[in-house]
């Protein structure tokens, strides 16, 4: 194991936010005229960027959504995060192992920095990544393009081939693979076939399994 940097996706890897976030996306899309369940939104948009979801919806609808459409969804998400958001079970174990074996960590998410400020703050994970939280807003193209993960590696001063990405979505895992990095898929016990198909080095059901693997 020759990892010199571990890059974590945020939603669904560090914080258990995907179900909460996609509930409000499904409500907003249904109201706009694109009926979709929370489960459907989670399946379709996992790891996606909200501004891109808005653009795709506008193409499907044939008209523009309100300019504050994205901001209103974030406002609802943030309110719910502050009340109910939890960290992913076992993520502290992974971070503890990496700290003990002196492998640096950072965050690379398609979400905006202010969203991570809320989600990582609420779950008390922010201090573990101070100054090392990066967003797709800082690069030209979001995941599944490799731009963000290459940016993370550059900012952290580590060659891509020595980076490990931990992802829960095929979209994000594809970005890590395209960047020339090793990628661990985290399935949370759900169907992991899509993560395997995009080229994850390994796929794990739990964070405890990842912690044990890294500790050996």
Give residue spans per PLM region.
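Asp-based, Mg2+/Mn2+-dependent phosphohydrolase catalytic module
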Residues: 1-4, 96, 112-216
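N-terminal helical cap/lid subdomain that shapes the substrate entry/recognition surface
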Residues: 2-100
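Short glycine-rich loop/turn motifs that provide flexible caps or phosphate-binding loops at active sites
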Residues: 11, 46-47, 107, 171, ...
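A generic structural signal for short
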Residues: 13-14, 42-43, 82-83, 104-105, ...
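Conserved SAM-binding loop
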Residues: 14, 87, 105-108, 165-166, ...
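Short beta->alpha linker loops
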Residues: 45, 49, 73, 86-90, ...
